């Protein structure tokens, strides 16, 4: 199974988290082939040169070759590249699993947090772009923890 891993990849923390998750995915089964864009030095060695068309063509080709796209949705906003990859996968009906671990999504039953929504600039919850999330959900699902993420990947593998 070919899996495309979409995630932010410009901060050291992002790179390390991506490596951590991809190792866990690869350890699920020997038949899994994960494409992690940050491992593609031809376009993602930031000391070298790759123009926008080179990057778009290389990553789009790998999205289109995938049987599953998995995406890290965490961040101030969903990473622009991740959103683009999700759009390509949606258009080609490629199944998707989104991972959204932001702790601000917790407390949906806390009445004080809910009441604060009526006070300007007091949103206690994190916002994700609903269009992008909708594309993921139309072709799959979004989960909030790593184990559920890995379980869904394994479930998809066994279909």
Over which residues does each language-model region extend?
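Conserved catalytic or regulatory cores that recognize and/or transform ribose-phosphate-containing ligands
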Residues: 1-159
């Amino acid at each position: 199974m070919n899996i495309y891993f979409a995630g932010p990849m410009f901060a050291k923390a992002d790179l390390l988290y991506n490596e951590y998750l991809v190792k866990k995915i690869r350890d699920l089964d020997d038949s899994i082939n994960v494409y992690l864009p940050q491992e593609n030095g031809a376009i993602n060695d930031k000391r070298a040169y790759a123009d926008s068309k080179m990057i778009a063509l290389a990553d789009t080709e790998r999205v289109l070759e995938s049987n599953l796209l998995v995406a890290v949705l965490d961040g101030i906003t969903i990473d622009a590249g991740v959103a683009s990859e999700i759009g390509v996968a949606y258009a080609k009906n490629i199944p998707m699993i989104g991972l959204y671990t932001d702790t601000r999504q917790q407390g949906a039953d806390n009445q004080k947090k809910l009441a604060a929504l009526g006070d300007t600039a007091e949103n206690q919850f994190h916002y994700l772009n609903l269009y992008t999330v909708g594309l993921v959900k139309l072709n799959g699902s979004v989960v909030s923890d790593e184990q559920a993420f890995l379980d869904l990947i394994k479930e998809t593998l066994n279909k």
